[in-house]
Design a protein with these regions (language model features):
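Glycine-aromatic micro-motifs
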Residues: 1-152
Length: 152
C-alpha cells in the first residue's frame, strides 16, 4: 500500500484527532523543523491558528506519521478546514539527524502579529505532544502558552 509521510505539529498531533480523519495513519517517530518558529495567526474564525515561519534560533517539534495515500485527501480536507494548506518545503529532522520530506500544512494567512492560541487547538497539541513523548521542554512551552498573561 502506498503512503505519505505527514508531519503533525498542530491539532492533528492528538492521537484521537488524527484517527478521526486518517484511521490508517501510524505514528513513526518524533522529529523537528530546525530554524522554524511556531506562530498563531488570524484565521477565518478570528482565533489563533497554529502555523510555521522560518526563523533562526527556533525549533518546532512534532510527530511523523505514515498516512495511507487513500486517506491523504481526508487529512488534507481536515487541515484545510482549520485554515491550513500544504506547502512547507523544509525537511523534518529526526532525533538521529536523518532528514525527511513530509506533507506539512501551514496557515493560509501570513503571520500578522502575535495571537493567542485557540484553546481547542492548544489542548490538542499538548495532548499529542505528551502522548508521543515529544521533548519535555517543548511540552512545557506549549503548556506555558495557555498560561501566558500576555495572551489573557
Amino acid at each position: 500500500m502506498k503512503s505519505t509521510l505527514y508531519f503533525a505539529y498542530a491539532s492533528f498531533l492528538d492521537p484521537d484527532r488524527i484517527a478521526d480523519v486518517s484511521p490508517g495513519a501510524s505514528f513513526l517517530f518524533t522529529a523537528h523543523f530546525p530554524e522554524t518558529r511556531l506562530v498563531f495567526v488570524d484565521s477565518d474564525e478570528g482565533k489563533g491558528l497554529p502555523s510555521l515561519v522560518a526563523e533562526s534560533g527556533h525549533t518546532v517539534w512534532g510527530g511523523i506519521f505514515d498516512v495511507p495515500d487513500a486517506e491523504v485527501g481526508a487529512l488534507t480536507d481536515a487541515e484545510e478546514g482549520e485554515g491550513r494548506v500544504a506547502g512547507w518545503e523544509v525537511k523534518a529532522v529526526d532525533r538521529e539527524g536523518n532528514k525527511h520530506d513530509c506533507l506539512t500544512f501551514v496557515a493560509k494567512a501570513s503571520p500578522n502579529g502575535e495571537h493567542h492560541p485557540e484553546k481547542g487547538h492548544l489542548d490538542s497539541m499538548i495532548r499529542g505532544a505528551r502522548h508521543w513523548s515529544l521533548p519535555a521542554g517543548w511540552v512545557m512551552g506549549l503548556e506555558d502558552l495557555g498560561e501566558d498573561p500576555l495572551f489573557s
